[in-house]
């Protein structure tokens, strides 16, 4: 796996799924391929994206700044500086300085990532802030190692939180989660189906599923009533794709 592929993988792992994720992936690909060289426009676009957390925006801004060639005097962006300030916690800043000194001695991406992984997310963000604000310099490889270590920590905590929700025994949370997933799957079916004649059936199934979820939420139903709802939808979607000659992995 090439360095840039690895960076793209780690960065995208912390972006919530949805159309915006696809857009960000495309921007990253363009930047890494040298196709997008307007850093100013890129940062303005990033600043106004909805849904993304300030830290995710800060990390993406840091990656764009590292990768896109720019004039030396180009102004640093406030939204990135704020996100990479470690919440103003002096402990984070102290640790960030210690980490920075260690990173100065590293020359490889993997070496930097290993060193960085033993620090907290706040310290890692502050260290990125030091480099972003030109208060310290490291090689691009080392900076990318720092980025990937930060993303790995964030993705780990997101995964733990997701696993807790999936394995929760609270029937109300499980019920709501199944309905949310069914609704999202139905939306995806409508997008995948397109406008061909064969798509009508898939669209109808998706539409009925969304109506059912709406009705279940409106009248309030027994927590077990949503069981299998998403799986039924996925089976319908796969059957439709088979008829269309499209093979797509299950997105359970």
UniProtKB/Swiss-Prot annotation:
Top-level taxon of the source organism: Viruses
Subcellular location, principal: virion
Keyword Kinase: no
Protein's cellular compartments: Virion membrane; Host nucleus
Region RNP-binding, annotated ranges: 165-252
Assembly and binders: Homodimer and homomultimer. Interacts with NEP. Binds ribonucleocapsid by both interacting with genomic RNA and NP protein. May interact with HA and NA. Cannot bind NP without genomic RNA.
More about this protein: Most abundant protein in virion. When expressed alone can form virus-like particles in transfected cells.
Protein name according to UniProt: Matrix protein 1
Species, as recorded: Influenza A virus (strain A/Equine/Kentucky/2/1986 H3N8)
Organism placement in taxonomy: Viruses, Riboviria, Orthornavirae, Negarnaviricota, Polyploviricotina
Gene name in the database record: M
């Amino acid at each position: 796996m090439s360095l840039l592929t690895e960076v793209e993988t780690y960065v995208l792992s912390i972006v919530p799924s949805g159309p915006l994720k696809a857009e960000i992936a495309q921007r990253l690909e363009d930047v890494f391929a040298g196709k997008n060289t307007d850093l100013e426009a890129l940062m303005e676009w990033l600043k106004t994206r909805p849904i993304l957390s300030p830290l995710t925006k800060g990390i993406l801004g840091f990656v764009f700044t590292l990768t896109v060639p720019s004039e030396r005097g180009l102004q640093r962006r406030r939204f990135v500086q704020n996100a990479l300030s470690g919440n103003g916690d002096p402990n984070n800043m102290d640790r960030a300085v210690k980490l920075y000194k260690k990173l100065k001695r590293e020359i490889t991406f993997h070496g930097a990532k290993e060193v960085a992984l033993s620090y907290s997310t706040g310290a890692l963000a502050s260290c990125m802030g030091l480099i972003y604000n030109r208060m310290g310099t490291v090689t691009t490889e080392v900076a990318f190692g720092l980025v990937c270590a930060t993303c790995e920590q964030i993705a780990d905590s997101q995964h733990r939180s997701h696993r807790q929700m999936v394995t929760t025994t609270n029937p109300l949370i499980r019920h709501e989660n199944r309905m949310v997933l069914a609704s999202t799957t139905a939306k995806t079916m409508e997008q995948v189906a397109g406008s061909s004649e064969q798509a009508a059936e898939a669209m109808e199934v998706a539409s009925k599923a969304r109506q059912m979820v709406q009705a279940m939420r409106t009248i309030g139903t027994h927590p077990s009533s949503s069981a299998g709802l998403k799986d039924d939808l996925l089976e319908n979607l796969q059957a439709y794709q088979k008829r269309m000659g499209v093979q797509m992995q299950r997105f359970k």
